[in-house]
């Protein structure tokens, strides 16, 4: 009788031990960062809510560009950039717009603070993941690639549209605190729509429904 020898077992494959990363624990704290902090809000808005709105709107704008205007944008990436676009504010807090842009010196100094905060966030990632998130948190603003430049314009427009929607919601709630902010933000968005037909389409087709009741929406 032949007795077969047991097959040799291959040694277990062990993945390299990696240090714990605090990146997503930090990102989860977006919910604690309050926006519009210098203004009386009928309903406070946190950074996490704003990030989701910007991501959804940015994805829509990119999709409009691809479907209607012959663009070849990566709509998923546009949404991701929108989702993380204010992540540095977890560290810096939300700087009110009138203060941030009060003069060129403050604006430039704040941008440097933002860049440092982004680097701090990226430093918490595992080394092999850092390049992926570097491209999302700090996209190539000086890129010569036309699609990349257009992507960042759409994310900026989505950010302003989200702010306009917040102003509309506050006005509908009877809060006169946001009247001036709504007028100035709407003016900025209208200017953007001159160069970005996707923004014009969003304003014409989607924006009017904001502020309606649930019965009106359905």
What kind of feature is each model-predicted range?
Residues 1-218:
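Alpha-helical, largely C-terminal catalytic domains
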């Amino acid at each position: 009788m032949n007795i077969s020898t047991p097959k040799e077992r291959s040694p277990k494959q062990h993945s390299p031990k990696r240090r714990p990363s605090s990146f997503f624990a930090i990102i989860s704290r977006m919910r604690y960062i309050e926006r519009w902090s210098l203004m009386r809000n009928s309903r406070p808005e946190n950074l996490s809510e704003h990030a989701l709105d910007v991501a959804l709107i940015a994805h829509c704008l990119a999709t409009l560009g691809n479907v209607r205007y012959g663009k070849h944008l990566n709509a998923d990436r546009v949404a991701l950039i929108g989702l993380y676009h204010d992540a540095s504010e977890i560290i810096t807090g939300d700087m009110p717009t009138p203060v941030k842009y009060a003069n060129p010196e403050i604006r430039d100094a704040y941008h440097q603070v933002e860049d440092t905060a982004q680097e701090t966030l990226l430093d918490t990632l595992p080394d092999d993941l850092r390049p992926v998130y570097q491209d999302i948190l700090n996209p190539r603003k000086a890129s010569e690639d036309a699609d990349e430049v257009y992507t960042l314009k759409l994310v900026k427009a989505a950010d302003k549209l989200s702010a306009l929607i917040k102003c509309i919601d506050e006005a509908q709630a009877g809060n006169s605190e946001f009247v001036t902010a709504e007028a100035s933000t709407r003016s900025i968005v209208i200017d953007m729509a001159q160069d970005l037909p996707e923004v014009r389409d969003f304003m014409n087709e989607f924006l009017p429904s904001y502020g309606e009741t649930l019965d009106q929406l359905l």
